[in-house]
UniProtKB/Swiss-Prot annotation:
GO terms for molecular function: protein homodimerization activity; RNA binding. Ensures the proper localization of the mRNA of the bicoid gene to the anterior regions of the oocyte thus playing a fundamental role in the establishment of the polarity of the oocyte. May bind the bcd mRNA. Keywords: Developmental protein, RNA-binding. Residues 420-437, 464-476 have a biased composition (Polar residues). The gene is exu. It comes from the Eukaryota. It comes from Drosophila virilis (Fruit fly). Residues 387-397 have a biased composition (Basic residues). Residues 202-233, 386-477 are annotated as: Disordered. This is Maternal protein exuperantia. The keyword Hydrolase does not apply. SUPFAM superfamilies: Ribonuclease H-like (SSF53098). The keyword Cell cycle does not apply. Residues 218-233 have a biased composition (Basic and acidic residues). One of its GO terms (biological process) is bicoid mRNA localization.
Length: 486
């Protein structure tokens, strides 16, 4: 970690080219000078350029900034799950609510939050008047944070003021890729675990010769630190911004014995400098991304059936649209190719896309051919049926030998749905005979009023007494009618 007293302004010298990994695109470097490194991250309503910022956060060893923003649109389900924030409406008012604490979050409008962010950056730069500007550090596999920030600034006419202070964006993902090559995922959480484990191993080796009391106190301190890190929720932009700075600092000082020295920040800047670029390059890329967005939207009718099925096929549709747009294709261009050369032309056009596998290319060719050909029906994605339904699993008795069913709790019997699940599961199947509860091992239910009550006995005895004391029946004689005579 970095001590608060360390000044984050370091003179950038010539970059060490040995830290750049082979195969990583190295852009035009930032001119040499004194720069302030600030880690930045955002929470958004989604992962599209048309989405909005929900939280804007920045971190330095000496200061930090965080502000929630009230968006016009709601967060999509994935964003709500990741950030644990949702939009609620009370009357005519909309507000943000935390799904962890169930409390209302104080938020501002986007223009007010951006103004506060620019004021904070200007104040940070004014504390170091000899600096040449600020470099914003972020960490993500696919570049998205700079585009969202720049687009919001362009929307409110604040880009000129922003470029006077901020000189570059730099992605620490490239640094992680060049520093740690034996891992599959380069997420902040995974990198933090790897670096923490390496730090613990080094500390354990150094403390082998210490006393038992000292080692026990050190282990307790490490456990408390790990528990604190587990409690931090990385779905928040403020937590990720701090984690981005600390992870990048440790990656650039893997061989350093004093990671909290002023030399550590110098190593961090020198390691990141090959991946920096002037802010004007990001603005141009934003314009290109807007063109790509229009191309992606043109493919919406093609992948309409994909978006109506499972999440897996929706993700594949998004991937296909992005790849086609980045390679300069839109629906009109591919339609012209199919009109001229049919399916063979589509196959030849997609062969140049190196980021797609052979089976993905074949799937795209068949899908586009079925869409353009009026004699064919647009292909629908194949959905694999589930093996066993959940209802069948619930109805199937699975008793272990020697274990009675009476020991099972109500939650095991009816699931987490409570009374609702119990009422649903108690409905018998009309196609089968309802099993007896005794045969299934359940406790037999006691019938109501199974014991004759005293009141019932008295009523029955009174009825029998009345029947016995009744007088005998009287037999009436049979009268014979007599006919009258003259």
């Amino acid at each position: 970690m970095v001590a608060v007293s360390i000044d984050s302004v370091i003179d950038i010298s010539a970059a060490d080219q040995s830290t750049a990994a082979s195969g990583v695109a190295i852009k035009d470097e930032l001119p040499n000078g004194d720069y302030i490194l600030v880690a930045v991250d955002i929470d958004t309503t989604g992962r599209r350029l048309i989405d909005e910022i929900v939280q804007l956060a920045a971190y330095t060893p000496t200061d930090h900034f965080e502000q929630y923003i009230m968006p016009y649109m709601n967060l999509n389900p994935a964003a709500r799950q990741r950030h644990q924030v949702r939009v609620i409406s009370i009357g005519f008012f909309r507000m943000l609510k935390s799904m962890q604490t169930y409390k209302i979050i104080k938020s501002k409008s986007e223009v007010a939050a951006l103004k506060d962010f620019l004021d904070w950056l200007d104040q940070l730069k004014s504390k170091n008047p000899n600096t040449d500007g600020i470099v914003l550090l972020y960490h993500e596999e696919r570049k998205f944070i700079p585009y969202m920030i720049l687009q919001s600034l362009v929307k409110y006419g604040m880009l000129d003021r922003f470029t006077k202070t901020v000189k570059s964006f730099v992605n620490s993902f490239n640094l992680a890729k060049s520093s740690i090559g034996d891992t599959k995922h380069y997420s902040l959480r995974n990198l933090s675990k790897i670096l923490s484990k390496a730090k613990e191993d080094n500390a354990r080796v150094d403390n082998d010769n210490e006393a038992d009391s000292n080692s026990s106190s050190a282990d307790k301190h490490v456990k408390n630190g790990l528990q604190k890190e587990r409690d931090e929720f990385d779905g928040s932009a403020s937590v990720r911004a701090k984690l981005t700075f600390n992870v990048a600092l440790q990656l650039s000082n893997l061989d350093s014995t004093e990671p909290e020295s002023s030399e550590a920040l110098s190593n961090l800047f020198n390691a990141l400098k090959p991946f920096t670029e002037a802010i004007s390059g990001d603005v141009k890329e934003l314009d290109t991304q807007n063109v790509h967005l229009e191309r992606q939207n043109s493919f919406r009718p093609v992948f309409l059936n994909y978006f109506k099925t499972t999440l897996y096929h929706r993700v594949r549709a998004v991937k296909f649209r992005i790849v086609l747009a980045e390679n300069g294709f839109d629906l009109t261009t591919l339609n012209d190719i199919w009109t001229e050369k049919r399916i063979e032309g589509l196959d030849a056009a997609l062969q140049g896309i190196a980021s797609l596998k052979a089976e993905d290319k074949n799937e795209l060719v068949e899908l586009l051919d079925s869409f353009f050909d009026p004699a064919k029906v647009t292909i629908k994605p194949i959905i694999k049926p589930s093996t066993i339904r959940r209802r069948n699993k619930r109805n199937t008795p699975a008793h272990k030998p020697g274990v009675g069913s009476g020991s099972r709790s109500a939650s095991d019997e009816f699931g987490a749905g409570g009374d609702k699940s119990q009422s649903v599961s108690s409905v018998p199947d009309s196609t089968t005979k309802t099993p007896s509860p005794i045969k299934n091992g359940g406790r037999p239910q006691r019938k109501r009023n199974s014991r004759p009550s005293l009141h019932t006995k008295e009523v029955k005895s009174a009825e029998s007494a009345l029947n016995n004391t009744a007088p005998a029946s009287i037999s009436l004689p049979n009268y014979v009618p007599i006919a009258a005579t003259n």
